[in-house]
């Protein structure tokens, strides 16, 4: 018997057949989309993929590999002089009989790399490795040929008499974008990853392929007697094209994207998890009731569990496998492929036959926008479809997409702005601190939102307002609350905005693009124009309130974070344009005015010489020069998360959970270790303990905050937790303040020092 897996026990034939079943599912669901992406005859493409699947794990016949499984399932090991120190995927291509399989010489490299790298290892193929593999082929693998034929029943003819390591020469240089068969390679190798991962997880590779989100969205419109707006009709008419769509807040961009997606597999991205969660709820259960969507970000499991979604673990696993029909995701989960990390082809091949929606592109840093633009270029070249939706589109990004050939006959671009004027803007020649009394007075009769640029500034403003009048309904929200408290506060601000409450909320730009809230008045520190206009969108959102007097106040003096968070030159240029618009036109700013100003301030002419421009161009240069497979998946993901951060529990919170969650986690570690030491292992009990440990770790993570590592480096405020499995969680030696007051959460969160003054 030749084994492939130990838990659950699975023979090589069973595992390979499971892959072939997923291949058929993929072909039936999206075969027509996949077939047009390569220059091969469609039947030949599927034949090659079937060959790769059949051969991918033949190297597992290697005796030491079989012994690893035999030991785990309680079977006697086979005598062998070899160690299990050569990966099975490096052996599998040895069996391919190219002549019998009628594989052209120029496709050998594609086939060998698709099989040989279906598990990615950071291994250099040198002469020592080649010699070692040849010895294994001669002294071990050749003796297994009959077993493969009799036990595995190979579907295709294999090499039997002489197994040579010559195929390794096809693995020495990775296939690059400029190579002739690059597209074919991406599709074959990428889909091999997908098929293998789904079969190994015993999950279907594609789910609910017939559930059309466009139909669900139009049904929602019909049931509520809504007509399709012009923007939605535009998307419907251009379903077969790529789209760049500029539309103001409240135009129905989400529904527009869903109508464009229609019956295609799709991925919908947004900058922040909280906004993705809200959108996922709207589409899954609140409005559209499309219950076939996945949610994919670093805390999606917690969110689905906390919000009582059934089968939440299955849903997250399916999203990670990219199996869901529609997936709501942060870009770090699905947009790593421009780094061409080891294994990037899985992501790239999947996006190639899907539609991808990028919402609010202007909300990302210039470096991340460079990654998105590089990714859009790659998707365009391979034949995939994208939609960029944004309220404001910096001209520098459009120009770069034009340079990269993305603006072609298959691209539709339109701007849809509402004629409703929602904001009467006053630029104050003072600091926010100088106008706190007016803010308090407004808070006694209106919903007032105060947005500042840093956590430190938010906390200071909160304290000062509290000292002026402790009776006003005063609330604080920023990123330095532990996860579970931040979720509660985010829910509180959403509820506050919905009901008849009056009072004041002080926040950072956390609220800009993430929370769907509507206030009467906005007071904000100056920032870049795109950021300011995002903030405007949290005031008089629907344009139903009178704006005879100013409802937006911008404070241009002593604003925090200028030069550290926001580029000083871009802030000043934007402020200059805004003041010209107010003085020469009107303080009642239209949506067209906003778009025009952002395009001007982010034109290449204006940006040259700024740090923003330098970061954007440098990032593109690095991406363009990258060689395939230099980075690992984790390294690519870390770059996309924009910042290296420490996940830490504030010391006071840690002291409260030290003898509960932390102790329980330690106890579970010990129980699992003991179970591994037993001769008669109870696999079910071990599985239960591991599941419980994972659950406890999720509870511990809810007690953490994320702090940029560079902010706390060398300050001595971070301490390790010396427990196996919790090494990546730290203790933060700062106070934590939050208490419940008459059913409301009150407090500053992590009480930070001057060293974190510019933290957002």
Language model regions located:
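C-terminal accessory region of SF2 helicases/translocases
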Residues: 2, 536, 542-760
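Accessory nucleic-acid engagement/destabilization modules that flank
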Residues: 2-212
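Conserved RecA-like helicase motor core of SF1/SF2 enzymes
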Residues: 83-86, 480-483, 487, 501-549, ...
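Walker A/P-loop
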Residues: 239-260
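Conserved Walker A/P-loop ATP-binding site and its immediately adjacent core
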Residues: 265-287, 297-300, 395-397
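Conserved strand-helix element at the start of the C-terminal RecA-like helicase core
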Residues: 265-276, 443-466, 476
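Post-DEXD/H (motif II) to motif III coupling segment of the RecA-like Helicase ATP-binding lobe
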Residues: 346-355, 361-415
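Interdomain hinge/linker at the junction between the two RecA-like core domains of SF2 helicases
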Residues: 395-443
